[in-house]
């Protein structure tokens, strides 16, 4: 069975079993809602156990979650550094033009026939996502996921076609 990262437990929060999670999912409200089931993996990416979310709230850049039946810091402290994953079968169907992060990261980016680089990360600074493109011999390129820039996404071909608008590439 395939699993996909949705977050990493970075610390505990208070004494009542809450944990700070650095989310790497574009569906945090869905993934961390009360009753949702996730799978814990340790630092060596080994399965630990399935857990059920008892509560979730946002605080600054973190998602604060609590697992069902784990209501004390001593119970959950050992999970610091562990990953939270969702089973592939639990992924939601997406609308046309929507993609999961794991589908986008690693795609090659082209402007015309020229390889620009590879998408290494997705940022969520505000109104739209920003794709971080790793380039050879140059600084990373930040591409907003908006229609004038991203022309086509072809998941099966692992290719993204873009038009780098004036001002986006400060090295040209």
Curated annotation (Swiss-Prot):
It holds the Pfam family PRC. GO terms for molecular function: ribosome binding. One of its GO terms (biological process) is rRNA processing. Its main location: cytoplasm. Residues 96-168 form the PRC barrel domain. GO terms for cellular component: cytoplasm; ribosome. InterPro entries: PRC-brl_dom, PRC_barrel-like_sf, RimM, RimM_N, RimM_N_sf, Transl_B-barrel_sf. Keywords: Chaperone, Cytoplasm, Ribosome biogenesis, rRNA processing. It is found in: Cytoplasm. SUPFAM superfamilies: PRC-barrel domain, Translation proteins. Belongs to the RimM family. The PRC barrel domain binds ribosomal protein uS19. An accessory protein needed during the final step in the assembly of 30S ribosomal subunit, possibly for assembly of the head region. Essential for efficient processing of 16S rRNA. May be needed both before and after RbfA during the maturation of 16S rRNA. It has affinity for free ribosomal 30S subunits but not for 70S ribosomes. Binds ribosomal protein uS19. This is Ribosome maturation factor RimM.
């Amino acid at each position: 069975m395939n699993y996909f990262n949705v977050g990493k437990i970075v610390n505990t929060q208070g004494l009542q079993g809450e944990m700070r999670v650095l989310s790497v999912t574009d569906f945090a409200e869905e993934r961390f809602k009360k009753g949702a089931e996730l799978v814990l993996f340790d630092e060596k990416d080994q399965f630990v156990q399935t857990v059920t979310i008892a509560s979730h709230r946002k605080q600054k850049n973190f998602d604060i979650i609590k697992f069902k039946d784990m209501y004390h810091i001593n119970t959950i402290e050992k999970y610091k550094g562990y990953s939270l994953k969702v089973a592939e079968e639990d992924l939601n169907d997406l609308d046309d033009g929507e993609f999961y992060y794991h589908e986008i990261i690693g795609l090659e980016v082209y402007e015309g026939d020229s390889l620009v680089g590879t998408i290494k990360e997705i940022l969520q600074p505000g109104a739209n996502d920003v794709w971080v493109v790793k380039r050879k011999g140059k600084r990373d390129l930040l591409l907003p996921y908006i229609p004038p820039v991203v022309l086509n996404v072809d998941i099966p071909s692992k290719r993204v076609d873009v038009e780098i608008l004036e001002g986006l590439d400060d090295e040209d």
